[in-house]
Amino acid sequence: MFFVLLITACNTKKCVPQGEYLLNKANIKVEDTKDVAAAELRTYLQQKPNTEILGFWKLQLGIYNTASLDTTKWTSKNARKVGEAPVIFSSELAGRSTKQLQLAMQNRGYFNASVDTSMVIKDRKVNLTYHVTAETPYTIRHYHVNFANTDLQDIAQNSRLSLIQEGMQFNTDLLNQERQRVASEMRRNGCYYFDQDLIKFEADSTRGNKQVDITICLQDFVNTMSVEEQEQLFRHYKIAHVHFHMDYEASRVPDGASLNRSVKDGYTFTWSGDKLLREKALIRNCPIRPGDEFNEGRLEQAYSNLNQLAPIKYVEINFEPISSNELDCHVILSRSKLNSVSVEVEGTYSAGDWGIAVGAGYANRNLFRGAEEFTLDGRASYEWRQNGGRAIEGKASMGLKFSNALAV
């Protein structure tokens, strides 16, 4: 079978239609700079050759080529499913790749970059090369922060944390990261409705000397919002109450009277049947607290903490505005399977002796309603010795893991 695949892999043109060409190679050569590797640019190619192993063997194409023209045969169906159809060269996709490569270079500050292609056609196969000429990159001459809101202005002007510095090479990826940083800081300081899509960058590259001036500011559509809508974007919201719904399905039961409920210090807990976790365990693992400002960082930490608790399968956290500057937080929890039993049987062979081993395990992921994990494992083996003897071996282990959720 190996030799069949090797032969068919060599005959890569078997399934290439007449008048068409197999895209055999697609290489990228970057000139004028060592800061951009050709491998980084391959993601922008709109058409890539068939997958190669060891740099030359198109194994999946070879598997595809083993299929006969009769697609009703089982072998042909599976060969086409497992294999990889030949990549037929497309001049249209090559043109798109050229534009994408040029755009990628411009996004890295190479505004005058150019991309040319060359082809070598032989034996119905195309070897394509993209020649990328980088030219001199543009650098940031001046960086301006232009926000009327003082909170936003202070965050964006923080030169210690800002990703944009004068003199650095222009890079749109860094600009987008700076947008995310500024928006995240706003949301970590109570601005629930603020979003990175509200921020834009304006670039002026007419200064000459391969330099560009950058200004960070609000999108134009913000000015078309009403006064109330604009104030809402920059308003600091506080958490009024935190509601824990300890059963994902029960939280959707229309008849609230069928649920168990407890209230404590601004926290509300609802559940049906057995309580998933103790109240203190949930509070300890949820840094979102009544009376505090909304903080996106604490939201992320709450997801991380709660998802690590074994009794919890799924976490969803939503916020509900209840006044002009207050939010209610709803933490919806879905319980996982708390008890599990496992059994494993295997044959053994050691130094000519045959045997059999049986292993069993039990786990409880919420022993004291505080996300404690109790495990009990055992293993027994029986071995027939060549000298006529017998060997029996057994071992057991027990463990109890206390989560940070444990509250006393």
PLM features per residue range, with description:
Residues 6-9:
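C-terminal motif of bacterial Sec signal peptides marking the signal peptidase cleavage site
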